[in-house]
Amino acid sequence: MASISDSETTNHGSIWDLDQNLDQPMDEEASRLKNMYTEKKFSSILLLRLAFQSLGVVFGDLGTSPLYVFYNIFPHGVDDDEDVIGALSLIIYTLTLIPLMKYVFVVLRANDNGQGGTFALYSLLCRHAKVSTIPNQHKTDEELTTYSRQTYEENSLAAKIKRWLEGHVYKKNCLLILVLIGTCTAIGDGILTPAISVLSASGGIRVQNQKMSTDVVVVVAVIILIGLFSMQHYGTDKVGWLFAPIVLLWFILIGTIGALNIHKYNSSVLKAYNPVYIYRYFRRGKSESWTSLGGIMLSITGTEALYADLCHFPVLAIQIAFTLVVFPCLLLAYTGQAAYIISNKDHVVDAFYRSIPDTIYWPVFIIATLAAIVASQATISATYSIIKQALALGCFPRVSVVHTSKKFLGQIYIPDINWVLMILCIAVTAGFKNQSQIGNAYGTAVVIVMLVTTFLMVPIMLLVWKSHWILVVIFIVLSLMVELPYFTACINKVDQGGWVPLVVATTCFIIMYVWHFCTVKRYEFEMHSKVSMAWILGLGPSLGLVRVPGIGFVYTELASGVPHIFSHFITNLPAIHSVVVFVCVKYLPVYTVPTEERFIVKRIGPKNFHMFRCVARYGYKDIHKRDDDFEKMLLDRLLLFVRLESMMDDYSDSEDFTMMEEKTQGSSNALLLTGKAGSNTMCSTGDLSYSSQDSIVPAKSPIRGNSLTRYSSQTFGDELEFLNLEFLNRCKDAGVVHILGNTVVHARPDSGIIKKVAVNYVFAFLRKICRENSVIFNVPHESLLNVGQIYYI
């Protein structure tokens, strides 16, 4: 392997000017009307149907909380009825302020084209302000139909906030760290939710048989968890239709049982709806009441998952489901349990199961277990989605992402993460064996994610919504007034199980931040080390090499410039393919890039060099699937570009053109071709409309993007065009080779000890255990050529 140092970086003077003239980044495309995402209008019947379906996806975790809340509030039993009333009052108003007021009616509106979660908020901010730490975006990316953002007046508060965020690198890093903290803690939820939900549901088998050992309950829970994680690779496509009926039946059951218990045991518990009992609760219990907030916090677990699992359900459907079904049923369930506990103070440990009438006990137990499985499945799926988003934004090591459904884009499975989650989940379940300590861990994880969301909502409200600063202050003050006391109570229980999410989150944070840091530094190094076009031109059309038949795809992270891997390759192996295509696969801060807008193709240098660049753009929900035939799509776009470029020769003297596919009115497969122009003359030829100042837009493309065909000179009437296309087809028939860089990254000798450990050991270890680029890009092994290099960052 060759070694590269930082001294080989920039070019200056005439060479730099020549390089800029011959190898500009993608030109800005002509402005056009974009199909911006807007909330779709649904009929009333369809809206109710979607609200019903959202129950099984969004609310499972929140709905299973009554299984374990009161036990975690009063782990040592209840002495006074007033304590139960005060705790119930806190539950009622916590449910009202956080899930209902904050999330359902405010935070859900901050979705990224139907996608929720911490990274969705970060993507919104990256589009509205230049806060991304990987500088691989270009203004052409802003022309995507899914790339929506606001414009600001120069002296507006939003413009000042935008400039402040963009002002210094450390502010961008602080924002990224905040996002990673929320993401890492949310991953911890993926471990704790299945553990506490399944363990609590399984505990019902012991209520009817008090002689049964606790170990039996743990074994049953572990068996269920193993089965749950082992079935993940099948996806939920075939059984997903059962989730909504199960969860709806669960909510109806707990609501009905709660109402019966209120009537049967103690209807005076309804006075808990008077918030004065919250004050009395704290005045009487003082430090013990404050400590119990960690248990009360569990009543809103699943609220953050409610936002992360948005899954393209319209916000209105989720609002309907929560306000009409979830919220009232939860209030009845908690109120009924409180009424039962007041009359049976010794049964607080198993209050939920003991309050069930004997005639329906086992059916309710079965539904409870199924509801716990559904809640766990939703959280596991949300964890996959979070990791996929982090992977797309360069914040997670490369892992294999598998589609489990041909119908639904969002249903994915990550094998490596699945088994790690299963092992950790079983370890937590078997290690703690009781709901109390797992509950302490769970509460800590949930409140941290909520605080991160609160802080991220501030720039969202200012930049995206352009809200008045007074409304922003009201939102953050009310949110922190509720969340900070819960946070302090949960942190106080670190030694009682609360350390688990902190350890998990810290480990994930180190992995994600080190990976992102080294990814950014490697990208910056490649930018500084790219080869000048003057050097390429000096080699001549043959590049000073033997041009062998075939097409070489050179993969690079650079969207402009010739990567150093190319010069390293031809220096050590003086032969290159007849056609060279530099392929840049990059992810943008959008949820998806439409297939017809995915590729940008450009020629590099004179035509007789036969060098091209292709940028393939993806959103954080898009996936490289094996059946996509990425290689074939690249070749199709390359042939189409050459044909359209030939058509432009009659109208422009320039040899530098850019082709970008886009949606246009009346044709979903229209293609946009832009180039340098010398006049403002309007011309037309056949189906082509051309303005030399703007663009060429074929309304109906004569070439289909999904087929490679032979072209005759009679078809195009242009011999040069025919020869170019025949040349490309012959090269394609000769074979395609994928050239990937296999770089080893080391810290520079003068680096500090922390950086050396992070780069030379942590990052190196992650590179060894993660998937290779060839696997991620689905490159055939027989067509793969790795080029080794060493980077010092």
From Swiss-Prot:
Entry similarity comment: Belongs to the HAK/KUP transporter (TC 2.A.72.3) family.
Q: Which stretches face the Extracellular side?
A: 76-87, 197-215, 260-289, 339-359, 433-444, 490-496
Q: Which PANTHER family match?
A: OSMOTIC STRESS POTASSIUM TRANSPORTER, POTASSIUM TRANSPORTER 12-RELATED
Q: Which residues are glycosylated?
A: 266, 434
What does this protein do, in the record's words? High-affinity potassium transporter.
What would you give as a GO molecular function for this chain, any one?
Answer: potassium ion transmembrane transporter activity
Q: Name the gene that codes for it.
A: HAK12
Write down the InterPro entries for this protein, in alphabetical order. K+_transporter, K_trans_C, K_trans_N
Name under which the protein is recorded: Putative potassium transporter 12
Q: Where are the transmembrane segments?
A: 55-75, 88-108, 176-196, 216-236, 239-259, 290-310, 316-338, 360-380, 412-432, 445-465, 469-489, 497-517
Alphabetized, the UniProt keywords read: Glycoprotein, Ion transport, Membrane, Potassium, Potassium transport, Transmembrane, Transmembrane helix, Transport
Highest taxon listed in the record's lineage: Eukaryota
